[in-house]
């Protein structure tokens, strides 16, 4: 499902643990490409339903394993580098994304990268809030910055209320 401007609707997933760290996963393929889980929204699927489907497919978590803390207001877009643009119709020039900030309420042992085949990721780490900006592939960097910036007040408010005054993490 590509929109009239050539952007594919997609959800991005920022998953935090109780220490405020974010799940950062390495894509299968040996290029040392790390990113947040993300995936396309199917025809007639809501962004929220796509969120839970992608969460299960990519990291093996279900709705009961997470709590939604926030979501970006509008669509955040990025353009693909020319070498990755699909020229056949419908032409896809990039992604437009709704980003969700989730808190893991289960133990991190519930995270399973082999939940679907083929796997999207081969390993993962917990990282600090702003760490991904220096590591994500360049063409996604601006959308990551915008998503993290927009969701940082929600993130800070959650951790201020749970960790105490003066303990904001970003």
From Swiss-Prot:
List the GO molecular function terms.
pyrophosphatase activity
Q: What is its EC number?
A: 3.6.1.-
Q: Which Pfam families match?
A: NUDIX (PF00293)
Is this entry keyworded DNA damage?
Answer: no
Spell out the CDD domains in the cross-references: NUDIX_Ap4A_hydrolase_plant_like
Instruction: From the record, give the transmembrane residue ranges.
Output: none
Q: Which UniProt keywords apply?
A: Hydrolase
| Domain Nudix hydrolase stretches | 6-149
Say if the entry is tagged with keyword RNA-binding.
no
| Ranges spanned by the short sequence motif Nudix box, renumbered to the chain | 39-60
What cofactors does the UniProt entry give for this protein? a divalent metal cation
List S-S links within the chain. Answer: none
| Similarity section | Belongs to the Nudix hydrolase family. RppH subfamily.
**Matching NCBIfam families:** PRK00714.1-4 (NF001937), PRK00714.1-5 (NF001938)
Functionally, this protein is described as follows: Accelerates the degradation of transcripts by removing pyrophosphate from the 5'-end of triphosphorylated RNA, leading to a more labile monophosphorylated state that can stimulate subsequent ribonuclease cleavage.
> What is the name of this protein?
RNA pyrophosphohydrolase
């Amino acid at each position: 499902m590509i929109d009239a401007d050539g952007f594919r609707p997609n959800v991005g997933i920022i998953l935090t643990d109780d220490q405020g760290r974010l799940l950062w996963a390495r894509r299968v393929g040996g290029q040392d490409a790390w990113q947040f889980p993300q995936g396309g929204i199917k025809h007639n699927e809501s962004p929220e339903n796509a969120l839970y489907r992608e969460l299960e497919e990519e990291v093996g978590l279900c709705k009961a394993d997470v709590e939604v803390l926030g979501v970006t207001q509008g669509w955040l877009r990025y353009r693909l580098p020319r070498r990755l643009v699909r020229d056949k119709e419908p032409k896809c020039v990039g992604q437009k994304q709704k980003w969700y900030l989730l808190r893991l309420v289960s133990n991190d042992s519930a995270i399973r990268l082999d939940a679907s085949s083929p796997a999207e990721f081969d390993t993962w780490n917990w990282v600090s809030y702003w760490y991904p900006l220096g590591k994500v592939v360049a063409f996604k960097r601006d959308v990551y910055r915008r998503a993290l910036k927009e969701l940082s007040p929600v993130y800070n408010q959650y951790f201020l209320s749970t960790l105490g005054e003066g303990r904001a993490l970003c």
